[in-house]
Amino acid sequence: GIPAADALLHTVLVGPTGSGKSTALQHLILADARAGRSVVVIDPKRDLVTDILERLPAERADEVVVIDPTSPTPVGFNPLAGPDRPEVTVDGVLAAFKALFADSWGVRSEEVLTASLLTLARQGGPAATLAAIPALLTNPAFRRQMTAGLDDPLGVSAFWAKYEAMSPQQQAQIVAPVLNKLQQLVIRPQLR
């Protein structure tokens, strides 16, 4: 196997079809599993994952999560349910949005999305998901509930005070680009 410290570096396996690349990966992955280390396997064909699951040590079986986007009961992933550092979590989510929507990204979209993400990440709980952003931006009662405990007069609290002072038409105008971007994600059950 590869020493754990070396496994943190990039590894490339190159060879023609049938030369044993998947078998080598399987051995490395199973060695990590036996050693109690976590492993992430991304396999679009599922062949490697299936082989690994068949050979996985029985004592590790309860620790396995298979994320299959074609499953009728997908495993959800909430990027806002991170550790106790909501700003770091939000920076990561925001960077992903910027990369996804680089062609249509603007200062206002970033401001609205940053305030929304920070609000939800700081509040936590089951309502703090990407799917809650439309309600946060369009439902005054939900927004009051989610912003009630915020104590950041120069940051998100200032954003929400300014937002609440806007007319419904002004609010709709500044949130429309964000809602359009989010719709592409929240419409899919696997991404909620």
Feature map (PLM): residue ranges:
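Phosphate-binding P-loop
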Residues: 1-8, 33
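Hydrophobic anchor at the beta1->P-loop junction of P-loop NTPases
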Residues: 13
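P-loop NTPase motor domains
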Residues: 16-19, 24-192
